[in-house]
Amino acid sequence: MNQKIIEILEKNNRYCSHGDTVNYADPPKVFEDCEGSFLFDENNTPYLDWQMWYSAVNFGYKNKRLSDVLHKQVDKLPQLASQYLHKEKVDLAEIICKYMEEKYGVKGRVHFNVGGAQAVEDSLKVVRNHTGKTHQFAFMGGYHGRTLGASAITSSYRYRRRFGNFSDRAH
């Protein structure tokens, strides 16, 4: 392990909050580059990324087509809070809704969110609000995210261990 990697690991231990992060190697692997489905360490050794950032980037790293579109959007209008409208948001919602109606025969609307755990949180709220019920079920062994609400419905000890038991809220 070279000095640069040692310094990164030391800074990680000193400055980064680990929360409920689980490292799959001890010491954790430090990656410096990526392409396609691979991550590369300081020696340019390729590692097949089975997680692909929790499936959020299953299009592959350094996808030129996607990078070009993202760069164009960042230059134009990088991000807006959800209460503001912009054409791209509405156009994407239309595409998704039309696809869902065509494929499944279901009309609906789109709720944009920042990630999977937040989507689980919002789903819990929608179900609770719509049904008035306070108990919900979740699948054994399922991963639902790391927010407090999502942790409440996971059976995984790894994600619940630091936050206590929420069995009164999920079955």
Regions inferred by a protein language model and the residue ranges of each:
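Conserved beta-strand and immediately adjacent loop positions that scaffold enzyme active sites
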Residues: 36-38, 109, 135
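Conserved PLP-anchoring active-site segment centered on the Schiff-base-forming lysine
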Residues: 128-147
